[in-house]
């Protein structure tokens, strides 16, 4: 797109005018340019004071010295307060703790009724809860091998029952949503 517009601009302007401007004296070129008169220059320079110029020059000179740079950096650090984003950065760097490692956290206590309803929902009421497996893994971050445990058949039956109940729930949920769509 730039090449097209650039070529159009070059084609629109005849090359002879450029030669005329190059060969002309600077005074005649300034006279042809809009706002380049002596009056325009005086108006532009009257906007600025000598005091402004000196102040700007002093700040540019002082920032080049090493001592002032060190002081400026220290002042910026002192002025900088912990803001909203700084708090978020600090929170992200903190590793989350497991619930059982936190102070004051206790696992929920199940009553006999909760355990009974849990077993009847799964259809497996003869199997004991998973408390033996939880005791073995408490405090460790590694996975536990269920095949090496003494009652591996119990765990496989328990997990199979859980999977069946999950599948039934998800299939029932999907069929309800499909009927609603139609």
UniProtKB/Swiss-Prot annotation:
Pfam families: TDRP (PF15683). Predominantly expressed in testis. Residues 49-58 have a biased composition (Basic and acidic residues). One of its GO terms (biological process) is spermatogenesis. Keywords: Cytoplasm, Nucleus, Phosphoprotein. It is found in: Nucleus; Cytoplasm. GO terms for cellular component: cytoplasm; cytosol; nucleus. Residues 1-71, 117-152 are annotated as: Disordered. Its main location: nucleus. Residues 22-37 have a biased composition (Low complexity). Residues 59-68 have a biased composition (Polar residues). PANTHER family: TESTIS DEVELOPMENT-RELATED PROTEIN, TESTIS DEVELOPMENT-RELATED PROTEIN-RELATED. Contributes to normal sperm motility, but not essential for male fertility. Belongs to the TDRP family. Interacts with PRM2. This is Testis development-related protein. The gene is Tdrp.
